[in-house]
Amino acid sequence: MKTNIISEEEQIEEILTEANSYNLRQEVITTASMFMQDDPELDKVAAYQMAYMEWIK
């Protein structure tokens, strides 16, 4: 049986693709980077999800 596990990079790229549809790709990248700098323990995918949500609200 094949499982559908997508990599961290694929998840981040999906988030950035969605952000790009709002012309917010770079803003999400920058904000995610700031979140990870502020909290080095933060999961990379979670940082991108949080940044995306911050920009599209």
Question: Where do the PLM segments sit?
Answer:
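C-terminal alpha-helical interaction appendages
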Residues: 1-57
